[in-house]
Curated annotation (Swiss-Prot):
Residue numbers bearing the Phosphoserine modification: S112
Result, substituting S112A: Increases adipogenic activity
Family label: Belongs to the nuclear hormone receptor family. NR1 subfamily.
Protein name as annotated: Peroxisome proliferator-activated receptor gamma
Pfam families: Hormone_recep, PPARgamma_N, zf-C4
Glycosylated residues (UniProt): T84
Cross-link (Glycyl lysine isopeptide (Lys-Gly) (interchain with G-Cter in ubiquitin)): K252
Notes on how activity is controlled: PDPK1 activates its transcriptional activity independently of its kinase activity.
PROSITE patterns: NR_LBD, NUCLEAR_REC_DBD_1, NUCLEAR_REC_DBD_2
Mapped zinc finger ranges (NR C4-type): 139-159, 176-198
Domain of life of the native organism: Eukaryota
Gene Ontology CC entries for this record: cytoplasm; cytosol; nucleoplasm; nucleus; perinuclear region of cytoplasm; receptor complex; RNA polymerase II transcription regulator complex; SUMO ligase complex
9aaTAD, short sequence motif: residues: 495-503
Length: 505
């Protein structure tokens, strides 16, 4: 990208981001109008005004989400958690899959964990972690640690096996009228009372369930834990209110949530299946079948497919930046930070969040585009000429590993807030208030993951490691943009993206 990629004129003190941020006084900052090929610019404090982008050369509405490096966590409580960059997957195979294979591939993944429930959001004040006994689910029969949901109740392996043997072998025990107390140490002393306790708590051979714990049962259990935690720590109710606030803001800011995307990818939606784009012919058909927000101008339709797709990615990136900015303004304490620090946090954080949320739209075979109307295959994107064919592959590699963590939207709402409030960004003026906010968010995220994923004891550390991976992906993305700038002299980058990428890694 030659001379057309020069930096656009912006406010020298704050830049284009400042126009989208609230002011602490009545003073307003407006961005100088910039004329660039392909896109007019208008980034106001209000929600995205799509009408001003109608002339954008947009072919496919892929969410090109980006990311960066998380070398340290600002809160001292978390500094000793090791971060490692996962080895990238190698996928160097020829593109020879057919349409039918990709249509079936859309449904290869299990559905994402269900929608957010307020009952699942349980938090503690910093450094006031609840006892381990509250975190473990107890066997309803003897009080030992439950291994899962067996015969209709949470039970340990011992009581599960005892009940199964009794039912299958039709065992009859000598009657006991002492109503013996059944606990971990005494459970083997009186088999009659133990079996009666199994029946009393609801164990039944007809209640065998396969798969994960039902959401209703999970919420009931978490509500019981919530009550116990609130009794020990009354302030946890305030943090749960914070979690609900973040989730509500997340839902309002991002139209296509992970839950909606996974429903489309797994075929669990009443809407029609997305149109699959897997080669040049299906690409041309898709332009007729998919309702894109922006029609490609006639003068741009003759451009090479790789360039048109890349420009479509740019448009979606700009739209995503505005969505993330709106979300950031709803994080408690963010708008009270120095305006320059707000701009810096967004500059370095938006692409990390973009790639985090892009993972929700991906499976190992492709990515949803145009709000779920289309599905563009991974192999088709990789088949584009270099350097364009190299852009999406690192994002797919990250997405496959990140999706394996099975975070849901309520987890992601806190996770992306943690990304934004990173106190180690270059050029911050006042780090202390940023670290204070992030420390609170980290505590919230840790407890959220413990309660929402009780079977994954190391999930918090794994999630933090993904923040390191995200920064590496952004670094690689910026390097590819430098290559395009040198080789594609007839292309231009959107002025807002130019400002974000300027001096970024």
């Amino acid at each position: 990208m030659g001379e057309t990629l020069g930096d656009p004129p912006v406010d020298p003190e704050h830049g284009a981001f400042a126009d989208a941020l609230p002011m602490s006084t009545s003073q307003e900052i407006t961005m100088v109008d910039t004329e660039m090929p392909f896109w007019p610019t208008n980034f106001g404090i209000s929600s995205v005004d799509l009408s001003v982008m109608d002339d954008h050369s947009h072919s496919f509405d892929i969410k090109p989400f980006t990311t960066v490096d998380f070398s340290s966590i600002s809160a001292p409580h978390y500094e000793d958690i090791p971060f490692t960059r996962a080895d990238p997957m190698v996928a160097d195979y020829k593109y020879d899959l057919k349409l039918q294979e990709y249509q079936s591939a859309i449904k290869v993944e299990p559905a994402s964990p269900p929608y957010y429930s307020e009952k699942t959001q349980l938090y503690n004040r910093p450094h006031e972690e609840p006892s381990n006994s509250l975190m473990a689910i107890e066997c309803r029969v003897c009080g030992d640690k439950a291994s899962g949901f067996h015969y209709g109740v949470h039970a340990c392996e011992g009581c599960k096996g005892f009940f199964r043997r009794t039912i299958r072998l039709k065992l009859i025990y000598d009657r006991c009228d002492l109503n013996c107390r059944i606990h971990k140490k005494s459970r083997n002393k009186c088999q009659y009372c133990r079996f009666q306790k199994c029946l009393a708590v609801g164990m039944s051979h007809n209640a065998i369930r396969f798969g994960r714990m039902p959401q209703a049962e999970k919420e009931k259990l978490l509500a019981e834990i919530s009550s116990d935690i609130d009794q020990l720590n009354p302030e946890s109710a305030d943090l749960r209110a914070l979690a609900k606030h973040l989730y509500d803001s997340y839902i309002k800011s991002f139209p296509l949530t992970k839950a909606k995307a996974r429903a489309i990818l797994t075929g669990k939606t009443t809407d029609k299946s997305p149109f699959v784009i897997y080669d040049m012919n299906s690409l041309m058909m898709g332009e007729d079948k998919i309702k894109f927000k922006h029609i490609t101008p006639l003068q741009e339709q003759s451009k090479e497919v790789a360039i048109r797709i890349f420009q479509g990615c740019q448009f979606r990136s700009v739209e995503a930046v505005q969505e993330i900015t709106e979300y950031a303004k709803n994080i408690p304490g963010f708008i009270n930070l120095d305006l320059n620090d707000q701009v810096t946090l967004l500059k370095y954080g938006v692409h990390e969040i973009i790639y985090t949320m892009l993972a929700s739209l991906m499976n190992k075979d492709g990515v949803l585009i145009s709000e779920g109307q289309g599905f563009m295959t991974r192999e088709f994107l990789k088949s584009l000429r270099k350097p364009f064919g190299d852009f999406m592959e690192p994002k797919f590699e990250f997405a496959v590993k990140f999706n394996a963590l099975e975070l849901d939207d309520s987890d992601l709402a806190i996770f992306i807030a943690v990304i934004i409030l990173s106190g180690d960004r270059p050029g911050l003026l006042n780090v202390k208030p940023i670290e204070d906010i992030q420390d609170n968010l980290l505590q919230a995220l840790e407890l959220q993951l413990k309660l929402n994923h009780p079977e994954s004891s190391q999930l918090f550390a794994k999630v933090l490691q993904k923040m390191t991976d995200l920064r590496q992906i952004v670094t690689e993305h910026v390097q590819l943009l430098h290559v395009i700038k040198k080789t594609e002299t007839d292309m231009s980058l959107h002025p807002l993206l130019q400002e974000i990428y300027k001096d970024l890694y």
